């Protein structure tokens, strides 16, 4: 494969199903704070392979609309939805987060994980404004991203960009809270910690022992080894630790 393969696509190819910076633990915090129930209408932006949407539909029986720009991810999501018999609960389509194809005040909950980090600040604001638009009054926005800590932000950003082959723009905790508040959201609550995406403990928690062994086995293949080692080293660097932030905001 190409050496410049985008990080989340690379990890998915290795067999990783949880592709969020705080892993299942952060996603579970969002779900616990999201007020999900059978009668709620949910939008997942950047639904990827449908892992979170499928979990929500199974747990709560809610109807979920999923959007993503990646046709390959959507094809995998559709296959996963059908394999779980959830075609009546989940619908996915290709759409841009900054121009959502939905009417105003259409959803009770919008969930968007590991995407806003990838956008420049102005694009972040456009996407968040769209989430605000399609949410019903008092609706909840649930997000999950990379958070900057410490003082050496430039080194962290450079290391991340080299590791995942994508230009990223994570923010500090105050930066994330501020961008949601500036967009009109209130009651902004956060949960944060060290990134667990590629930590041994986090991988086992997210993927199980056998899933983790499968990922490691694939990672050690000659064509994957260099990029995996680079990502593993960056994501577990003790001097430039990467953090996640999960945010629950109300319209």
Curated annotation (Swiss-Prot):
Keywords: Methyltransferase, Transferase. It comes from the Bacteria. GO terms for biological process: methylation. Pfam families: Methyltransf_25. Gene3D superfamilies: Vaccinia Virus protein VP39. One of its GO terms (molecular function) is methyltransferase activity. PANTHER family: GERANYL DIPHOSPHATE 2-C-METHYLTRANSFERASE, ZGC:194242. This is Uncharacterized protein HI_0095.
């Amino acid at each position: 494969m190409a050496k410049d393969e985008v990080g989340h696509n690379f990890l998915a190819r290795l067999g990783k199903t949880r592709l969020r910076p705080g892993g299942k633990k952060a996603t579970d915090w969002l779900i616990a704070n999201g007020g999900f129930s059978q009668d709620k209408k949910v939008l997942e932006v950047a639904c990827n392979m449908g892992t979170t949407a499928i979990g929500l539909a199974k747990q709560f029986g809610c109807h979920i609309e999923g959007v993503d720009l990646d046709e390959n991810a959507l094809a995998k999501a559709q296959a996963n939805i059908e394999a779980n018999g959830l075609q009546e609960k989940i619908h996915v389509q290709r759409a841009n987060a900054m121009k959502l194809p939905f009417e105003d005040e259409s959803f009770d909950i919008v969930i968007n994980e590991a995407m806003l980090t990838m956008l420049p600040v102005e694009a972040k604001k456009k996407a968040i404004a769209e989430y605000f638009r399609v949410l019903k009054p008092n609706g909840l926005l649930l997000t999950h991203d990379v958070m900057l800590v410490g003082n050496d932000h430039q080194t962290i950003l450079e290391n991340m960009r080299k590791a995942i082959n994508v230009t990223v723009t994570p923010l500090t905790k105050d930066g994330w809270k501020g961008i949601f508040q500036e967009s009109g959201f209130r009651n902004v609550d956060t949960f944060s910690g060290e990134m667990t995406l590629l930590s041994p403990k986090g991988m086992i928690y997210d993927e199980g022992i056998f899933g983790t062994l499968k990922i490691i086995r694939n990672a050690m293949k000659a064509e994957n080894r260099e990029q995996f080692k680079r990502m593993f080293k960056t994501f577990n660097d003790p001097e430039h630790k990467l953090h996640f932030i999960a945010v629950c905001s109300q319209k």
